[in-house]
């Protein structure tokens, strides 16, 4: 449960950057052009790389999880023979499809429906902002309830959110409501999904097995 909550906190903090970047990008591109904007984003990326270098891996004595004697190949073989793991990989493909669809096409979609470009930027910012709360709640609930139920509910509500947005008359209010609702569900799948992988196979190869799930994203 602690691991699931920790994953939700990391996801939530990552969403804070997603909240800020559309606002900054929209302003910077208009005022200073793409060269300056790209330079600033490069500096931010370098900062992240430097921070990652100092991340400390836990020693064996600090680990509270029991690990198996499985080899890398054995763990991979077991995973792909497990129906639940295949379903997770497939589900995360749908998750990535949702996110890419919204991130790529919604900004142009709202402009085509007569709204301004700042509205598109606001939608993406709201997605990042509300994903902070969605990820934290998902992590908390995943530690208390069935993770597969949490995951199923998130995917179902995402579909409802997209359908309502498409068939609702275009306005800033409907756009902002969509950004908030979809943002709440944006990456709230991560804590539940990583928790299920850890529950199925333990933590020894969690990074690799969850990485494969995320690859399908």
Regions found by a protein language model. Name each.
Residues 80-140:
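Extracytoplasmic gate region of multi-pass secondary transporters
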Residues 9-60:
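Helix-loop-helix hairpin linking two adjacent transmembrane segments in secondary transporters
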Residues 125-131, 137, 142-196:
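C-terminal transmembrane helical hairpin of 12-TM major facilitator-type secondary transporters
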Residues 18, 187, 200-217:
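A late C-terminal transmembrane helix in Major Facilitator Superfamily
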Residues 56-74:
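Flexible cytoplasmic inter-helical loops of multi-pass small-molecule transporters
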Residues 10-18, 127, 131, 213-217:
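Structural signature of transmembrane alpha-helices in multi-pass secondary transporters
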Residues 1, 7, 188-201:
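Intracellular juxtamembrane helix-capping segments at the cytosolic ends
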